[in-house]
Amino acid sequence: MILANDELKRLISLGRLKVEPLAPDTVRENGLDLRIGGEYAIYAYEGAVVKPCELDSARPLFRVVKADEVVIPPRNFVLLTTEEYVKMPDDVVGLANLRSTLARYGLVIPPTVVDAGFEGNITIEVVNESPNTIVLRRGMRFLHLILVKAEGRALYSGTYQGQRGVTPPKGLRGEC
């Protein structure tokens, strides 16, 4: 069941769902609109051979940029972080979607689940499929998070729990 505006506000008022900072236009009809944070990550090298199964961390492959503008080159991608620090209830799952206006410029994100019990800034991959450089601004609403009630409870305890700022991917050594 998708949670609507009144239920989202109720969960926030009870402290079960936390969104900090909480702007007046964050809670929407059927989800949360989240803003671009103050940093992003982009690959530091072009043409490198990346072998996730041999990495403990991919952080050295990325350059973290602190800026008020996010520059996304044509047919490239960046990792964006939300301005908001989110704490999900243990029985609610988030489904992340790019706001449709940005998709109309040629930006896309992969299907992304924010697990029940997750806490942290959300890092999301944004791909520019267009032939043009696209520049986004810090603080603009970019991510629409649909919240869905889960059957039962879960507690997320993964690598990205408690992340602050943009977080490059973990390595997959030992998982392949």
Curated annotation (Swiss-Prot):
Keyword hit for Metal-binding: no
InterPro entries, sorted: dCTP_deaminase, dUTPase-like_sf, dUTPase_trimeric
Lineage: Archaea, Thermoproteota, Thermoprotei, Thermoproteales, Thermoproteaceae
Protein name: dCTP deaminase
Cross-referenced SUPFAM superfamilies: dUTPase-like
GO terms for biological process, alphabetical: dUMP biosynthetic process; dUTP biosynthetic process
Gene Ontology molecular function terms on file: dCTP deaminase activity; nucleotide binding
E.C. number: 3.5.4.13
Name of the gene: dcd
Active-site annotation: 125
Organism domain of life: Archaea
Function: Catalyzes the deamination of dCTP to dUTP.
